[in-house]
Amino acid sequence: MENLVEIKYNQTGQSKLINEYGMREMQARAFEKRNSQYLLVKAPPASGKSRALMFIGLDKLINQGLKKVIVAVPERSIGSSFKNTELKSYGFFADWRIDPRNNLTTAGGDSSKVNAFVRFMESDDEILVCTHSTLRFAYEKLDDKVFDNCLLAIDEFHHVSADTNS
């Protein structure tokens, strides 16, 4: 069968080169905006968006005075993108480290995930990964003020509903 559709992109390899901090071009561009209150990172699949969030989250914790980083993903399998990651060996100033009890994307009951989220918010722990669903249900149990001084990152933002009950 004849190939009816073929798309060729002008590939230079530039997007895979890393800078002195171990960042790809897109990650470095996102990191330049790390002082912004709101960020929307839009990039193709497998371009390093999760790692860009790690760089920004660590900077917010270490250099900008935020107390917590919460990453919400649409489904548990995506949570593995936020596992412990060595960044210092590539030139960054810190590694991404998440306590296993704060990775709420592993198998287990939903109510215990919500309780674990509440425990995280009451603790000195800094990084948590959960599903959108866990965030939504935990949010209902918490006062809005506990989210002050937190970076709340919504991965796969297009999955989020605008419904006020969601």
Language-model regions, residue ranges each:
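Conserved pre-motif I regulatory segment
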Residues: 2-42
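Inter-Walker segment of RecA-like/P-loop motor cores
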Residues: 91-139
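Walker A/P-loop
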Residues: 36-57
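Loop/turn-to-beta-strand initiation segments
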Residues: 67-68, 123-128, 148-151
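Conserved catalytic network of the ASCE P-loop NTPase/AAA+ motor domain
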Residues: 62-64, 119-122, 143-146
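Conserved Walker A/P-loop ATP-binding site and its immediately adjacent core
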Residues: 50-54, 60-61, 65-92, 97, ...
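SF2 helicase catalytic motif II
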Residues: 132-134, 143-166
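Alpha-helical elements of the RecA-like P-loop NTPase motor core of helicases
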Residues: 80, 137, 162
